[in-house]
C-alpha cells in the first residue's frame, strides 16, 4: 500500500535514508530518540520534504515528487493549525473545499464526522473558545473528512493530560478502522504506541533500526528495546 525505497533526505549533508512497507489498514507506531528522524520520515511521506533520491509509492502509484496538496495523505501535528478567525464548521469544511462552498452531501459528511468526534455542538464556535482537547478533535475531524487512505500523526496529543490522550488515541484508532485508513503515528511514548499499534518502527540516526511487534519491543527482548531505554 505504502512503500518507501531508500528515500533519502540530506540533513546538513548527512543522509537520512528510509525503506519501509506498510499494508492497507495497518496502524504503525514510529518510535525513537529525539532528533532520530521520526518527523523527517513523516514529512517525506506527506511531501513536505523533497527527497534527494529514492522512491515512494502509494497503491502502486509513484508519489515521490507529488506536492502535499495532491498526495492521498492527511497529517495531524501537535500544533493543530486551526484558523482562529473561522468557526469549527468552517475549519472542518476546509478539508472538503478550500473555498468553503460545500454541497448538501459535503455538509452532511462534515456533520457526520463532527458527531463522530463529539463536537457537533461546537460547530459555531471559534477555536479560541475551545479547550486543547476540543481543538485537536476539530483538527482530527478536518483530517478524517478528507477521506484519504493514509493518516499521519506527529505527536498531536503530547500536550494533553494522560486520560485525554488515551481517549484521543482510542478515537483515532476506531476512526481509522471504520474508514479502513492506514495510520502512522510518531510518539515518544511506547505505552501510547502499545494502545493502538501492534507494529512499531524504531528510528535511530536517520535510519530504521528495527521494526516488529510492539509487544516484543515492550518486553525488552527486541534488539532496539535498549534504544528506547527498555530493559527486560
Swiss-Prot record:
The residues that hold ATP are 32-39
EC identifiers of the protein: 7.6.2.15
UniProt domain ABC transporter: residue ranges: 2-230
Query: Which InterPro entries did the record assign?
Result: AAA+_ATPase (IPR003593), ABC_SmlMolc_Importer (IPR050093), ABC_transporter-like_ATP-bd (IPR003439), ABC_transporter-like_CS (IPR017871), P-loop_NTPase (IPR027417), Thiamine_ABC_ThiQ (IPR005968)
Primary localization: membrane
What are the protein's UniProt keywords?
ATP-binding, Cell inner membrane, Cell membrane, Membrane, Nucleotide-binding, Translocase, Transport
Pfam families membership: ABC_tran
Q: What is the protein's membrane topology class? A: Peripheral membrane protein
Look up keyword Transport and say if it applies.
yes
Q: What is this enzyme's catalytic activity, as reactions?
A: thiamine(out) + ATP + H2O = thiamine(in) + ADP + phosphate + H(+)
Q: Which GO molecular function terms does the record list?
A: ABC-type thiamine transporter activity; ATP binding; ATP hydrolysis activity
Q: Domain of life of the organism in this record? A: Bacteria
The record's Gene Ontology cellular component field reads:
plasma membrane
| Cellular compartment(s) | Cell inner membrane
Sum up the protein's function in the record's words: Part of the ABC transporter complex ThiBPQ involved in thiamine import. Responsible for energy coupling to the transport system.
- Subunit record text: The complex is composed of two ATP-binding proteins (ThiQ), two transmembrane proteins (ThiP) and a solute-binding protein (ThiB).
Q: Which family does it belong to?
A: Belongs to the ABC transporter superfamily. Thiamine importer (TC 3.A.1.19.1) family.
This chain belongs to the protein called: Thiamine import ATP-binding protein ThiQ
Q: What organism does the UniProt record list as the source?
A: Shigella boydii serotype 4 (strain Sb227)
Amino acid at each position: 500500500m505504502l512503500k518507501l525505497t531508500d528515500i533519502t533526505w540530506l540533513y546538513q549533508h548527512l543522509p537520512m535514508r528510509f525503506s519501509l512497507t506498510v499494508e492497507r489498514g495497518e496502524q504503525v507506531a514510529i518510535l525513537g530518540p529525539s532528533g532520530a528522524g521520526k518527523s523527517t520520515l513523516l514529512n517525506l511521506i506527506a511531501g513536505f520534504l523533497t527527497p534527494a533520491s529514492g522512491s515512494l509509492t502509494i497503491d502502486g502509484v509513484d508519489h515521490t515528487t507529488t506536492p502535499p496538496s495532491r498526495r492521498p495523505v492527511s497529517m495531524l501535528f501537535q500544533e493543530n493549525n486551526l484558523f482562529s478567525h473561522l468557526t469549527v464548521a468552517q475549519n472542518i469544511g476546509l478539508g472538503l473545499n478550500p473555498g468553503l462552498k460545500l454541497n448538501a452531501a459535503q455538509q452532511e459528511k462534515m456533520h457526520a464526522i463532527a458527531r463522530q468526534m463529539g463536537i457537533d455542538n461546537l460547530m459555531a464556535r471559534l477555536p479560541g473558545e475551545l479547550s486543547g482537547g476540543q481543538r485537536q478533535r476539530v483538527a482530527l475531524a478536518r483530517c478524517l473528512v478528507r477521506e484519504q487512505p493514509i493518516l499521519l500523526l506527529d505527536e498531536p496529543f503530547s500536550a494533553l493530560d494522560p486520560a485525554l490522550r488515551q481517549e484521543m488515541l482510542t478515537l483515532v484508532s476506531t476512526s481509522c478502522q471504520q474508514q479502513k485508513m492506514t495510520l502512522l503515528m510518531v510518539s515518544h511514548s511506547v505505552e501510547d504506541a502499545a494502545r493502538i499499534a501492534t507494529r512499531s518502527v524504531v528510528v535511530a540516526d536517520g535510519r530504521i533500526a528495527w521494526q516488529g511487534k510492539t509487544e516484543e519491543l515492550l518486553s525488552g527482548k527486541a534488539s532496539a528495546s535498549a534504544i528506547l531505554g527498555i530493559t527486560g
